Amino acid sequence: KVRKDFEEAGIEDLTQKDVEEHSPFHWVLEFATVYASGGFDIIIGNPPWDVVAPNREDYFTKFDELFRTRGPSDKDETQERLLEDPEIAEGWEHYQNKMETRAAYFNGSSQYKLQDPDIDGSSVGNENDLSMLFLERAFEVASDESYVAQILPGTVFVGAAGKDLRNH
């Protein structure tokens, strides 16, 4: 089922191993009894306020613990030096591809329909903001009579990309 979701989102060349590497969480399987009764009665959360995109600080900090504290030019030099190691370079490319696949999934999945509202005839994307993705998922897994409480960034409430989420 999860692999089919990736294919539906336009990502067709993934193997089962590739899908497993993304560690998908299958809500219906994990909470079958909750789904059978209509969804969760209450959802409380503080979702991440990041975007689904490659982040060199996340990756290169594994090889240089001071990477996050370095200035921009020092980060560039350190990254260049680290990428001289073929294993690190291959891992960086793999990490970037993995993040691009995740972004493509969220952009193409029918499960996330509230992420690119139409404003004055133009589609406004949100760069796969995790807080907005989590909020849309909360709408899906909540029962009709449930309470949802989330700590969210202001862009959800005032940004153009949050329009469909607010109207939902």
Language-model segments: which ranges?
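SAM-dependent methyltransferase catalytic-core segment centered on the flexible catalytic loop
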Residues: 2-168
